[in-house]
Every structure is written in C-alpha cells, then in structure tokens.
C-alpha cells in the first residue's frame, strides 16, 4: 500500500509502454482479464478474509451461547462450555458454491484465482440501507451525482473501471458516515473519482482539472483533504472487483478461443458496450445495492444471452440471480426502446481500447422511464397471480453462435 505522501504525486508509466514497468500495479490495465485476476494485494486480502471468517464464526458462537459468562473458565467449572448444541455447526457453510468457469491458466491455478475473486467480493461489501444514515439526502441525489461523474469521465476520456471504482468508493464511504448534507455530495463524488483515476489511469487528469469541473464548488485543497478522509474511512481498501470487471471476465470466458491466450480480449466491443450501458443505467438506481457486483453483471449478461451461457461463464445458478434479473427488467426495456448506442471514437484512444472508455448517455431520462415501468410491473405482479416482466432470451436455434445478441 502506498504511503500518503506518495499517493498524491506519484507518476505512472506512459500509456502504451510495455515491458516490466507496465506491470508495476495490477490496476493499470483495463481490458486485460489477467489484470483483474492478478492482485498484488493478495496476501492482504487473505488476511482480511481470515479475519472476516473469524468474525463470522464468533457471531455464530454468540448466537448459540446466549450467556457469555458460560465461556469464562472458573475454579469450580470445566473450561469447556456445557450444554452447547454443536449441531448448529453442521450446516455452517463458509465456502462459495460457485463453480469456476475459468479455463486452465498457464500462470496460476484457476481454482485459486477464482477463490481469490470470490473472497474479494465477499470482503468488499456495501450497505444497501446506508441512506437511512443520512435523513437529509434522497436517492435521487445519488443518481444525479453518479450521472454527473459519468459525464466527467467521458469528457476526460477516463475508463469505465475508473468510474465504477469511484462509484464503489462513494457508496462504501457513505455507509461509514452519518448525517451527510447534500452540499458535501459533490466534493465526496469528485474526490472518489480523483482517487480512482490515480489508481486506474496511466495519465490521470491533474488536480486542478478535477476542481475545474465542479465550477468552483470544490477547491483543490478540499479535494485533497476529502481524499484522505475517504481512504481512511475505507481503511485503505481500494481494490474491489467492480461490476464492469466481472462483466469483462464473463465476456472473455464466453468468447474464449483456444488459439489465443486468455490474457487477450476476444469479445466484440459493440456487445460489451451494450451490456455496459445497461449496467450504467442500473447503477444509478439505489436498488442496485441489493445485489453483489457479480450478480449484477451476470444478470445484465442474461438479458443479452441465455440462462445457459450465464451459468457457464459466471458459475451462478438461475435461482441465485433470478431476483436481480427480474429487478433489471424495466431497465432493459428502457434501453431496448431507445436502442443501444454505437461504439464511440475518441481522439488519442487506440481502436482496441474504445469500449473501455466510459460514456455518458441520456441516463436520467432513461432512468425515469425505467422507474415508471418498474412501478407498472410491480402493480401487475401485485394484482396478478402469475409473475410478469422477465425478458425471455431467444431460443437456442435463433441465437448467434457466440450466444450473445446485440440490440
């Protein structure tokens, strides 16, 4: 982990340079599936996971033993607890049941890599009820802020991963705070993006450029101060596996070609952008906090493919993502009505990297349409004994060979 003094001023290697210098930080590569799998902080993650399991075991023990004093040894009692029903531990399952969809890797054990990814998702948890800590805020304020951050990312040609890192930092930071006022939201948001850009971008925008886009609302000193506050509140845990990281992995597995290395992206850029736009819309709704990033990415993929392909590339069973798929239906309907955007071209960005640049669509209008459809579907499901709203993928005979269909 970097020192605080290094965090603000450290320069990264030039974009496009190869060799060993380009692999100093695993976060520096975007489309590379291996980047999301190779984690320089793996040992730290293992320690954090060990602590989490110890905490979970302690909670399970406390639920069984209602009287804490039963575990305190006394001169006239045995050290072992008496009357404890150990049958509660029989069904204790601390390991994930998701099977690994990863192919055989030449540089690591695929099962170990997959376990590391699952452990990371379980470590970087979000609080779906954090808005209750802030009575002066409304979910719409979060929506407007994230939509604005998307626009900033497109203006500065920042990567999708940069935006989703900032979104993750913002949501997790807000879960650690109480009674935040709306006048601080923009400062928290732009500071989160400032941190994410320094982690992910090879040439991040300068500090004064982040202050400039706030139109004088946030000064450079305020951004630097909030940067440190956010990182301390997050306990310097700044390396989550974001929703777009999961999507990148799923797409890579779906289009895996045995003739090429798994390290190289092989999927169509246009289809990736279409699915990413659905996720861009969904993440603006605070309801996305109900689901993990892996589930969100798998559900979005389902709306463009099939249940079979989703299970193959994600390791999820249908029952594990069914609720999220149904929640995502109004958003998918809104996207399909207007049609997906074409792949945008950015000056100075290599053609093979265009799909990784975060774009900004008319998200707020689309979100209003999606939420209106959400209310209609909820009313239909309430009055009808038969559930409605799940978009059924085409039959297997009508799909593209790869199993994904563009809008």
UniProtKB/Swiss-Prot annotation:
Region Disordered: start-end pairs: 1-29, 383-407
Keyword Hydrolase among UniProt keywords: no
One protein family per Pfam: Cyclin_C
Alphabetized InterPro entries for the sequence: Cyclin, Cyclin-like_dom, Cyclin-like_sf, Cyclin_C-dom, Cyclin_N, Cyclins_cyclin-box
Locations listed in the record: Nucleus
Annotated GO CC locations: cyclin E1-CDK2 complex; cytoplasm; microtubule organizing center; nucleus
Compositionally biased spans, kind Basic and acidic residues: 1-14
Keywords for the protein's UniProt record, in alphabetical order: Cell cycle, Cell division, Cyclin, Nucleus, Phosphoprotein
Family (UniProt): Belongs to the cyclin family. Cyclin E subfamily.
Subunit structure: Interacts with CDK2 protein kinase to form a serine/threonine kinase holoenzyme complex. The cyclin subunit imparts substrate specificity to the complex.
Protein name from the UniProt record: G1/S-specific cyclin-E1
């Amino acid at each position: 982990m970097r020192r605080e003094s290094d965090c603000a001023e450290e320069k990264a290697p030039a974009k496009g340079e190869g060799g060993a210098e380009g692999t100093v930080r695993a976060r520096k590569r975007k489309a590379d599936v291996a980047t999301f799998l190779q984690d320089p902080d793996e040992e730290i993650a293992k320690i954090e996971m060990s602590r989490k399991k110890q905490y979970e075991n302690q909670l399970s023990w406390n639920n069984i033993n209602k009287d804490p004093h039963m575990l305190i040894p006394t001169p006239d009692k045995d050290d072992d607890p008496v009357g404890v029903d150990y049958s509660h531990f029989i069904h204790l399952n601390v390991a994930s049941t998701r099977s690994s969809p990863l192919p055989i890797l030449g540089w690591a054990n695929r099962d170990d890599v997959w376990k590391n990814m699952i452990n990371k998702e379980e470590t970087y948890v979000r609080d779906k009820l954090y808005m209750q800590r802030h009575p002066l805020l409304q979910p719409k304020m979060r929506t407007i802020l994230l939509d604005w951050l998307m626009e900033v990312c497109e203006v500065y040609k920042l990567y999708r991963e940069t935006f989703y890192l900032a979104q993750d930092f913002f949501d997790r930071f807000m879960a650690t705070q109480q009674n935040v006022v709306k006048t601080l939201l923009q400062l928290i948001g732009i500071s989160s993006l400032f941190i994410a850009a320094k982690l992910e971008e090879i040439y991040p925008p300068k500090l004064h450029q982040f202050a400039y886009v706030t139109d004088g609302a946030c000064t450079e000193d305020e951004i630097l101060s909030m940067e440190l506050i956010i990182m301390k509140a997050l306990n310097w845990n700044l390396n989550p596996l974001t929703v777009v990281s999961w999507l990148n992995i799923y797409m890579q597995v779906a289009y895996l070609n045995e003739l090429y290395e798994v390290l190289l992206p092989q999927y169509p850029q246009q289809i990736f952008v279409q699915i990413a736009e659905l996720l861009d819309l969904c993440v603006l709704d605070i309801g996305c906090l109900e689901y993990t990033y892996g589930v969100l990415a798998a559900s979005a993929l389902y709306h463009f493919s099939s249940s079979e392909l989703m299970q193959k590339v994600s390791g999820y069973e249908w029952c594990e993502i069914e609720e999220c798929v149904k929640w995502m239906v109004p958003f998918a309907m809104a996207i399909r009505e207007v049609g997906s955007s074409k792949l945008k071209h950015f000056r100075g960005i290599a053609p093979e990297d265009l799909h990784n640049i975060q774009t900004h669509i008319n998200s707020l209008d689309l979100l209003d349409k999606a939420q209106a459809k959400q209310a209609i579907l909820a009313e239909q499901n309430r009055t009808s004994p038969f559930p409605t709203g799940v978009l059924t993928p085409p039959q297997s005979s009508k799909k593209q060979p790869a199993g994904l269909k563009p809008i």
